[in-house]
C-alpha cells in the first residue's frame, strides 16, 4: 500500500507515430475519471490508426478522433469535466502537457486529446474566489460584484480544459509534428497536416 500522502503510480504509455515515439505519463490521482477514460480507449485500441488532424505550431497538436480518411471513430459517452480539481492538484496547460479536447460543453470530452506545444494559460480553468455570493470577480477586464457562486461554477467560459498527463520523452517528435506543413483536409478547412501524422498505437509500458 502507498504511504499516506503518496500519489498513485502514474501509468506510463508510448504513443507510437509515423514520426517517432512519444512517451507520456498520466495522473489518476489528479484526474481519475479522465485517466480511466483514456486508458479504456487505449485498451480498446481506439487510437491505433488515428491521426493528428489539427496542428497549430504555437498552440497544440490534437488527435485521436479520426482515421487517415477523416472518418470519425465511434466513441463512448462523454465524461465529466475534471479541470478544476486537476488544476488545484497542480496540472496546467503548459508545454508538453496533455489535455482532453471537447466542444463548448465542458462535459463533452470523449477520446480526442491534445498536447500543448507552448504554455497555454488561457486554457486553464478560471479560479473562483471563496464566498457565496462572490463579492468580487474579475474576468477579462470586467469586474463583477456579489455574484451567486453557482452562476460562476456553471459559467461555460470558466471551465477550461482538463489536463491529465505530460510528455516525459519525445518532445522532439512533438515539435516535428507541430512544424509540419498544414492546409485543408477532409471536412477541415485549415490546420490539417498535408502529410498524415498517424498514431500507429498507444500502449502501456508500465
Language-model segments: residues:
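Cyclophilin-like peptidyl-prolyl cis-trans isomerases
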Residues: 1-206
Amino acid at each position: 500500500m502507498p504511504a499516506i500522502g503518496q500519489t498513485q503510480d502514474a501509468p506510463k504509455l508510448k504513443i507510437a507515430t509515423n514520426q517517432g515515439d512519444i512517451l507520456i505519463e498520466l495522473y489518476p490521482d489528479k484526474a481519475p475519471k479522465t485517466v480511466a477514460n483514456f486508458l479504456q480507449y487505449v485498451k480498446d485500441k481506439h487510437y491505433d490508426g488515428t491521426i493528428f488532424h489539427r496542428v497549430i505550431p504555437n498552440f497544440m497538436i490534437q488527435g485521436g478522433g479520426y482515421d487517415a480518411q477523416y472518418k470519425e471513430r465511434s466513441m463512448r459517452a462523454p465524461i465529466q469535466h475534471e479541470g478544476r480539481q486537476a488544476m488545484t492538484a497542480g496540472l496546467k496547460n503548459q508545454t508538453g502537457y496533455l489535455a482532453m479536447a471537447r466542444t463548448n460543453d465542458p462535459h463533452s470530452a470523449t477520446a480526442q486529446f491534445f498536447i500543448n506545444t507552448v504554455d497555454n494559460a488561457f486554457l486553464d480553468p478560471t479560479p473562483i474566489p471563496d464566498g457565496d455570493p462572490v463579492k468580487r470577480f474579475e474576468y477579462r477586464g470586467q469586474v463583477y460584484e456579489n455574484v451567486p457562486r453557482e452562476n460562476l461554477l456553471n459559467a461555460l467560459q470558466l471551465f477550461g480544459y482538463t489536463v491529465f498527463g505530460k510528455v516525459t520523452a519525445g518532445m522532439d517528435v512533438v515539435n516535428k509534428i507541430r512544424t509540419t506543413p498544414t492546409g485543408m483536409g477532409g471536412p477541415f478547412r485549415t490546420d490539417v497536416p498535408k502529410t498524415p501524422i498517424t498514431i500507429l498505437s498507444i500502449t502501456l509500458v508500465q
